[in-house]
């Protein structure tokens, strides 16, 4: 009997232990912890003045971890020597900040941790915590706020850096390229910003969307926005900054032999003003032509006849800029003449373009035949598009038809006198009812205007310039949802012009209709866009 009671007691104890162990591991044994961590103390205290410490400790009531600190943490003013902040990759009850930089006198510093602090167990955020101190006798408390928009596109980049440069005796016009700002913040989810803990003074207000964040402007990769006039702090103004990508400054890079009788001239920026001249001695029958590579910042200089030399000397001009280039000449092969149609689906009023790998010289329409699916033949009209180095074929088309295009030998001749072999291509048209049309009426326009349909990311689909109050018709548009954009063409050149920080010019004004435009197949749509002042 005693043994039975002993065994029973042992089983009860074991059962209780196992039950407690099981409860510790269950996910249904109580409410989920949603309480964020709490700061117990900070050493030195937050909002300290006369700060001269080299290390800061922030102690929490539970273990915390730092997530995505490099992206989330904003230190304002920025430090030349980055501080060391722990824990990294592990959890701790204490966040430590070791300062290595020499702190500026009488300056308020702010460490904004964004959404980087979370408890270790449930990941509850301790959002937008700021540790603030002053090396002077008081904490600066002034602020500046506003919004950032994109000058051209409807959508605005996330986490745009907004910067203030103090305008004092050390300020200079190109400071944004070389020095970090006095104060920094980033835009919130609604593209708003607020720069806090500022001291009274005059400032340059800018914004940057950086490819590689370092708070200095890199023209090739970054977007910039700026306020043309300096701002004064304190200020009650809500500032609006329009972010834009500058046109890259022209820079000649290099010249190299790409193939026989072909020299490639690489550059950055605007290349339409480039002029290339050969300085080496050439024969009397020497001839040359230049084409631009599609989607590349390269001009190809083609010449004939072949010159038996070790090198060629060129002069490259661009407005007031003059460069010279020496190109070593090797025994390369001549480029083969090859062709590629730029589309296999054509609208009824659309031309067929066939691009060539070498410069086109002559064409013979009599050696080109077009046949539809009913074996009806026609001879197209032909032309050359120098910008694409392509032949342009125009012929009568009907809806829902297939066309076979044959170019017989000698239909096309390139710069070197090489003729095409027989070429065969097939293209097709769709039903007219597969497309939609839209008529757009602009109200309150200040002309000229460029009216555009764009896709979601701002890519241009249709575009038309108008110089007076007249409806804009976009016909045979693929069905879909589009945005309606109007560019105020201030300089009347028919294209959107971006801004320049150094030249102190802002990008041309752009307005988007508040509602998207839906293009439906076999449907005529009518839209009215009232422009605001």
Identify the role of each PLM range.
Residues 127-128, 209-247, 325-337, 416, ...:
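Structured interaction patches on ligand/partner-binding surfaces of diverse proteins
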Residues 4-13:
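Sec-dependent signal peptide recognition
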Residues 478-479:
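Short, surface-exposed loop/turn motifs with a glycine/proline- and acidic-biased composition
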Residues 2-5, 21-208, 220-226, 248-262, ...:
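Acidic, low-complexity Ser/Thr/Gly/Pro-rich repeat segments typical of extracellular/periplasmic
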Residues 437-439:
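Intrinsically disordered, low-complexity terminal regions enriched in Ser/Thr/Pro/Gly
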Residues 445-446:
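Charged regulatory segments coupled to nucleotide-binding catalytic modules in large multidomain enzymes
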């Amino acid at each position: 009997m005693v043994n039975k009671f002993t065994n029973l007691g042992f089983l009860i104890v074991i059962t209780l232990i196992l039950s407690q162990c099981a409860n510790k591991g269950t996910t249904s044994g109580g409410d989920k912890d949603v309480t964020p961590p709490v700061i117990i103390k900070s050493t030195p205290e937050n909002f300290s003045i006369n700060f001269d410490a080299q290390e800061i400790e922030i102690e929490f009531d539970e273990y915390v971890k730092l997530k995505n600190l490099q992206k989330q943490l904003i230190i304002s003013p920025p430090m030349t020597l980055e501080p060391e902040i722990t824990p990294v990759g592990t959890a701790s009850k204490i966040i430590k900040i070791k300062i290595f930089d020499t702190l500026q006198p009488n300056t308020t510093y702010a460490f904004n941790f964004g959404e980087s602090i979370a408890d270790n167990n449930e990941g509850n955020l301790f959002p937008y915590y700021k540790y603030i101190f002053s090396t002077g006798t008081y904490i600066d408390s002034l602020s500046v706020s506003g919004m950032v928009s994109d000058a051209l596109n409807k959508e605005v980049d996330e986490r745009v850096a907004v910067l203030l440069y103090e305008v004092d005796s050390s300020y200079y016009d190109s400071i944004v390229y070389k020095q970090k700002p006095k104060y920094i913040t980033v835009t919130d989810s609604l593209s708003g910003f607020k720069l806090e803990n500022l001291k009274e003074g005059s400032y340059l207000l800018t914004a940057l969307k950086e490819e590689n964040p370092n708070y200095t402007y890199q023209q090739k990769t970054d977007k910039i926005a700026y306020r043309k006039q300096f701002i004064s702090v304190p200020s009650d103004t809500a500032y609006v900054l329009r972010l834009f990508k500058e046109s890259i400054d022209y820079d000649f890079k290099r010249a190299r032999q790409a193939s026989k009788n072909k020299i490639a001239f690489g550059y950055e920026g605007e290349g339409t003003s480039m002029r290339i001249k050969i300085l080496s001695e050439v024969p009397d029958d020497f001839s040359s032509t230049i084409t631009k590579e599609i989607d590349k910042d390269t001009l190809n200089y083609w010449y004939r006849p072949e010159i038996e030399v070790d090198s060629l000397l060129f002069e490259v001009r661009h407005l007031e800029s003059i460069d010279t280039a020496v190109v070593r000449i090797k025994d390369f092969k001549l480029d083969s003449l090859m062709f590629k149609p730029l589309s296999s689906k054509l609208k009824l009023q659309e031309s067929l373009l066939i691009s060539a790998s070498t410069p086109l010289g002559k064409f013979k329409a009599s050696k080109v035949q077009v046949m539809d699916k009913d074996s009806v033949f026609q001879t197209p009209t032909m032309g050359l598009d120098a910008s694409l180095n392509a032949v342009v074929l125009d012929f009568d088309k009907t809806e829902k038809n297939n066309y076979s295009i044959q170019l017989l030998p000698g239909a096309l001749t390139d710069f070197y006198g090489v003729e095409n072999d027989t070429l065969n291509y097939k293209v097709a048209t769709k039903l007219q009812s597969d497309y939609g049309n839209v008529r757009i009426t602009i109200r309150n326009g200040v002309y000229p205007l460029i009216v555009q349909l764009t896709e979601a990311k701002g890519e241009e689909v249709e575009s038309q310039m108008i110089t007076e109050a007249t409806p804009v018709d976009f016909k045979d548009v693929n069905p879909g949802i589009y945005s309606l954009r109007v560019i105020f063409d201030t300089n009347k050149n028919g294209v959107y012009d971006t801004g320049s920080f150094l030249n102190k010019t802002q990008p041309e004004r752009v307005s988007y209709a508040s509602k998207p435009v839906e293009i439906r197949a076999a449907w005529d749509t009518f839209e009215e866009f009232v422009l605001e002042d």
